[in-house]
């Protein structure tokens, strides 16, 4: 994928969001579907990358950067007690919360402020599509691991050789920093780690946080 096409895709997402208003797609209990930028199939496939059981009764799940909340509500549907956080109060999350009669706890909280003393600990933490929006990705991963007792599910945009032909970035633990709007014309995209860098971040974060044992951090990689 060329630099231009990568940026065009992000801009297409933004135009679609401006038109549709929803980032996530939903299917309501009565069968009504709400169309968002991301299809239901795409959302389900993202979750399927991780070893998350269909039956989550008795489990606590944290969704970091919940946005419209599909992943939060899906975890609740599977029986989990769910806490969702984001850095802003998203009215679409609250609207869907009401439509579903949900009991998910929704909090406006920065990932950097996560701590067991503040939110408790969770069997599963979802950290999906958030890392590249952060100035301090390793610190954020350490905060995620500090509240995880079993599985931290991580996916992120990664910088690959197709973005920088001839650079062999895939296997090197390097990262691009976007000072302004270099990535897709958006000022909230800060970093582009290579696949090797993402894996190294996850290993480091998991080993740095020693508050629990048996933790697994499972990263997956998306090019855009």
Identify the meaning behind each predicted range.
Residues 36-57:
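Conserved alpha-helix/loop element of class I SAM-dependent methyltransferases that forms part
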């Amino acid at each position: 994928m060329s630099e231009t096409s990568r940026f065009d895709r992000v801009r297409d997402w933004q135009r679609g969001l401006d038109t549709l208003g929803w980032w996530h797609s939903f299917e309501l209990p009565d069968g009504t579907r709400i169309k968002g930028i991301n299809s239901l199939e795409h959302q389900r496939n993202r979750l399927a990358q991780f070893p998350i059981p269909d039956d989550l009764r008795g489990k606590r799940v944290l969704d970091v950067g919940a946005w419209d909340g599909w992943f939060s509500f899906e975890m609740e549907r599977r029986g989990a007690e769910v806490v969702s956080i984001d850095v802003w109060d998203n009215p679409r999350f609250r609207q869907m919360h009401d439509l579903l009669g949900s009991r998910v706890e929704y909090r406006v909280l920065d990932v950097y402020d996560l701590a067991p003393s503040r939110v408790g600990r969770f069997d599963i933490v979802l950290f999906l599509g958030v890392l590249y929006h952060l100035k301090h990705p390793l610190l954020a991963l350490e905060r995620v691991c500090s509240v995880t007792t079993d599985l931290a599910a991580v996916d992120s945009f990664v910088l690959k050789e197709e973005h920088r032909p001839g650079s062999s970035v895939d296997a090197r633990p390097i990262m691009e920093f976007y000072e302004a709007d270099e990535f897709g014309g958006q000022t909230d995209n800060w970093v582009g780690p290579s696949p090797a860098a993402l894996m190294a971040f996850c290993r480091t974060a998991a080993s740095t946080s020693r508050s629990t044992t048996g933790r697994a951090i499972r990263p997956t990689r998306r090019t855009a």
